[in-house]
Amino acid sequence: MSSGPRVVDNLEIAQRYISEAAEAGAVVVALPENFSLMAKNQSDRLAAARVENEIHTFLSEAAREHRLVLIGGSVPLPATAGRVTNTCLVYGRDGECLARYDKMHLFDVELKDGESYAESRYIEPGDKLAIVNAIGTRIGLTVCYDLRFPEVYRELVRQGAELLTVPSAFAISTGRIHWEVLLRARAIENLCWVIAPAQTGDHPDRSTWGHSLIISPWGEVIAEKPSGTGPIFAEANLMELRELRSRFPSLEHRRL
């Protein structure tokens, strides 16, 4: 997706992509970080947070209508002291909310050429991991900058995760060098499927790298969106994943 500052427009686009994925037979659909709003300022985020029920309803109805598990990227939800959480919501095939994950690691960095980010000024970090039991497996939830903290993924795997989701809005300067490398590393070291839907293109206050990816537990890029917007697809064979973990039991060889 290439989300903008109007929630209603972003939800309309998301609905189109969800429907397209469902028609292709998808049983799990994941949206990118900030799918409902790429804000110009904090007042826009707070305004979106105040209409959170609209976004909840959208996700619930889309999941129920298409009978799929819908991983809602991330949305702004009300927090304290004028801040919001950057929250991934997951809805099941019956439209019920299965899990909530608040992004733990906030992007406070200074990049080259004056590009800087300070998410902690307007986002309240989460402090709990989240795993979803669905489609006969366990899905570990993360968001964007969490990707740089491998201990998060190792703990999710320790708790039984076989699929890892990383909805993101990576900066172009970091995405060009780090995005695919980090995702493949998380897949390889944890012997997990990695699903990474990404924002792309120009937004009100920034540009994003895009390149949504689905990566196998062996680190192979199975599906990629090298440019533009729209869904990508892959079949995650869980029996093959479990057989791989049995033949190549690196997760059982840990010493720490």
PLM segments and residue spans:
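Generic N-terminal amphipathic, Lys/Arg-enriched alpha-helix
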Residues: 1-4
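Cys-nucleophile CN-hydrolase/nitrilase-fold catalytic domain and related Cys-dependent amidase chemistry
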Residues: 7-102, 171-192
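CN hydrolase (nitrilase-like) catalytic-core segments centered on the catalytic cysteine
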Residues: 51-71, 138, 144-232
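Short beta-strand scaffold segments in enzyme catalytic cores
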Residues: 72-73, 87-90, 130-132, 212-214, ...
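Active-site catalytic loop in hydrolytic enzyme cores
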Residues: 79-159, 172-174, 179-181, 247-250
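Short helix-loop capping/hinge motifs at secondary-structure junctions, enriched
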Residues: 96-99, 220-222, 242-243
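A short C-terminal boundary segment appended to hydrolase-like catalytic domains
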Residues: 239-256
